[in-house]
């Protein structure tokens, strides 16, 4: 075995191994499409079987979201508005300056809760897609979501 031939391979292997274990920050460019506004916070939310779901959706839209959420890697329990910890909120709200179009959404992640607000189901869908991109496996059956504040709206009308 010639050490000169093996040395570059060993160095490359150790560099790759080190990159695998290095925690990479979530950048706006990591989310596709790139959100209009994204602010990284500190800490993260642990999405697990203990996470509860609260939504103000009703009727057919609520049933549609119930089926959609069954596809998540974590099954969520229903909650009441008074519950405050380990919560995922999906909320339809009136139109605001932060939510100018039906496809706009805000996504807020703290260590206690995840909140997606939109003026329509389409906005909630896009917010959920962004949340799925941010989820990173943490331990068996749970996912870590970094603390972040995102406001997004389509740049072009469809």
What name fits each language-model region?
Residues 28-158:
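Contiguous, structured surface segment used for ligand recognition
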Residues 1-30:
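Bacterial Sec-dependent N-terminal signal peptides
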């Amino acid at each position: 075995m010639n050490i000169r031939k093996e040395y570059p391979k060993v160095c490359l292997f150790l560099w790759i191994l080190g990159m695998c274990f290095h925690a990479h920050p979530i950048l706006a460019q990591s989310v596709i499409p790139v959100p209009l506004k994204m602010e990284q916070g500190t800490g993260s939310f642990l999405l697990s079987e203990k996470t509860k779901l609260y939504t103000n959706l009703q009727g057919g839209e609520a049933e549609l979201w119930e089926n959609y959420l069954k596809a998540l890697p974590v099954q969520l329990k229903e909650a009441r508005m008074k519950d405050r910890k380990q919560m995922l909120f999906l909320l339809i709200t009136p139109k605001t300056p932060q939510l100018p179009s039906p496809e706009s959404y805000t996504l807020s992640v703290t260590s206690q809760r995840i909140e997606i607000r939109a003026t329509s189901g389409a906005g909630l869908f896009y917010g959920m897609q962004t949340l799925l991109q941010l989820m990173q496996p943490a331990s068996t059956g749970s996912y870590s979501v970094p603390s972040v504040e995102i406001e997004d709206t389509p740049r072009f009308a469809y």
